[in-house]
Amino acid sequence: MCSPTNFLYEPFSSDAVTQNYDQNLKCTKCGAYYSMACSLREQNVWTCLFCNQSNSNAELPLVPSNTYTLTSAKKEILSRRTIMIIDAICDPHELNYLVSILCNNYITRQQEPLSIITIQQSGHVILHNAVNHRRDAVFSINEFMTKYNLDKLNASYFEKKISEINQESYWFDKSTQGSLRKLLREICKIANKVNISSKRDKRCTGLALFVSSVLASQCSLSAYCHIVSFLNGPCTKGGGKVMSRERGESMRQNHHFESKSSQLQLSKSPTKFYKKMLEKFANQSLIYEFFIASLDQIGILEMSPLITSSMAVSQFDSFNDERFAMSFQKYLNLRDHNAIYNCHSKIMTAKNAIVVKDFPKYSLNPKNLSLPLEISLGHNSAEAPIQFQTTFENQTEKYIRIETLLLPKANRSFGAQNEIVFSMKKIASRIIDSFAYSSKHTKELMKQLFLLPNQIRGKDVDMVNLIQWCYHIYRSPILSVRNTSPDERYLFLHRIINASKDTCLSLCKPFIWSYSDLKHDWIVLDVPLTRAQILQDDKTTICVDGGSYLVLRRGKLLEKEGRELCCKLLNDLQRFPQPLYVETKTGGSQDRFLKSKIIPLDITDKETLGTEDMTFNEYFNLFTDLSGSK
């Protein structure tokens, strides 16, 4: 039997020529649509690619295209609301900066209803009233009924308390912007400094997220609600708790997944809580997004049921960080101009196809969407047609996009990079979907990675190059926990799932930009990160783009030009979440960060870097031994 073809469908990756279609372009027998590959038997008569039915049409498309789009204008603009959860357990100076960003960037452009919820140090969660703050809805984790109903996810208890006052009074609009600014300033005034005590603060993140979901559920089913959380630490009380209040107890680490430790059990409980919470509001169009002012873990791994995209989480050292201001501005621009909702894609014509991971319904940046498919195409011809239908909407219109592609047969190769990206997405999906982060499960996936080169033998693929890419996957947080916390690894896996092909490759094997005197421009070098380029050369300035980070290694030459290139890459709207930016020089304090990203190719590299990692030579020998034993 012919092995399936691995394919990545990226419907929004480029601005391809599209045109509106009409029903005359639809096959009368199977329902497939006309494409450029359809043969013309005579004038205005075309043969369907999928069933060979002859179809007549008075006017065939004038613009040659395989992509057709049906656009329907909506009767009303997309109904959208926003709930902001502000963690007030924060340094006052930092909270002031967050509030100034919200006032200057969001409130000035506010077009939709906004609600404010704060997480207080005392274990209180406050839903603020837009008309009279004395009528705020206050929920305390210290009250038995609140904690009991939260654990039971009893929404009616919270609905009753919210509905004691007209629930619309909890929403700020353009007419109440003055009250909103006043409220935000008041939140800063009453926020206490970090509490120095024997226990951690009562931070009830789960309670705040549940209250916000209940409030959003009382709106129209057709309304989309963004629940945007600005967090400063992990949940320590109530549903969603990921860390003990005892300062001697730490959050779970990678090694806790190897045993039935108390930290691991504490990790599973909030995951179950958020999973049930998501199921409870499944009929609502709720979108959870997080801005986190802490590079430490706060429980993103446990919140995984709420996170549908890597773009839903942005993490910084603090809200004072310039990267936060830039990232939040990008977020607003993408949400207003690029985001799509209610996205679904299906294969109209291929029966033997398996979707590895569906598109998320909401995408902040659809150009990154990639649908990995395993398609059995058979043996008959050199090429096989396949047709996709993707439906989505933005703030003003609804779309149906039909796209026809010709796929090469399984005995022809897409190239090593396509196979690698597909494998990355497949492995990442399996880890996230099964919540399996133990080394035992990792070893099972490692075996699949070793088998990949053997599975595509006979194809036109550079096998050594393919094995090198497999080694990069082995060294990445997909399969390695080296220098990576559970939260960081989870976000990395989500980036892989939601990233375009090029971004996936940079996450796996960083791009190295260097200036070419021949081309008078910056180019990507096809060389590995080795000691020759990174650890010894102190003359040449290079830029290392690892997808989630950007490192400028300053040399004696072209330092200014290198910084300009980095600024250009950082300011690209499509780079979201905002990459971490690091500048270093030979022997500089940030050299350790860059060295942690370097793979040891041989024993000399291993000794220079002081790492226990398997070198590429060792990996290649292991692969050769395993292949020879089969």
Swiss-Prot record:
Where it sits in the cell: the answer is:
Cytoplasm; Nucleus
What keywords are assigned to this protein?
A: Cytoplasm, GTPase activation, Nucleus
A molecular function annotated in GO for this UniProt entry is: zinc ion binding
One Gene Ontology cellular component? COPII vesicle coat
The cross-references to Pfam families, in alphabetical order and at most eight, read: Sec23_trunk
The knockout outcome noted for this protein's gene is: Leads to a significant growth defect in the temperature-sensitive SAR1-D32G mutant background.
GO BP terms in the entry:
COPII-coated vesicle cargo loading; intracellular protein transport
Coarse class of the primary localization is: cytoplasm
Q: Reply yes or no: does the keyword Cytoplasm apply.
A: yes
What else is on record for this protein? Present with 450 molecules/cell in log phase SD medium.
Name the protein family. Belongs to the SEC23/SEC24 family. SEC23 subfamily.
Function of the molecule: Acts as a GTPase-activating protein (GAP) for SAR1. Contrary to its SEC23 homolog, NEL1 does not associate with SEC24 and its homologs, nor does it associate with the COPII components, suggesting that it is unlikely that NEL1 functions as a structural component of the vesicle coat machinery. May function as a signaling molecule.
Report the protein name in the record: GTPase-activating protein NEL1
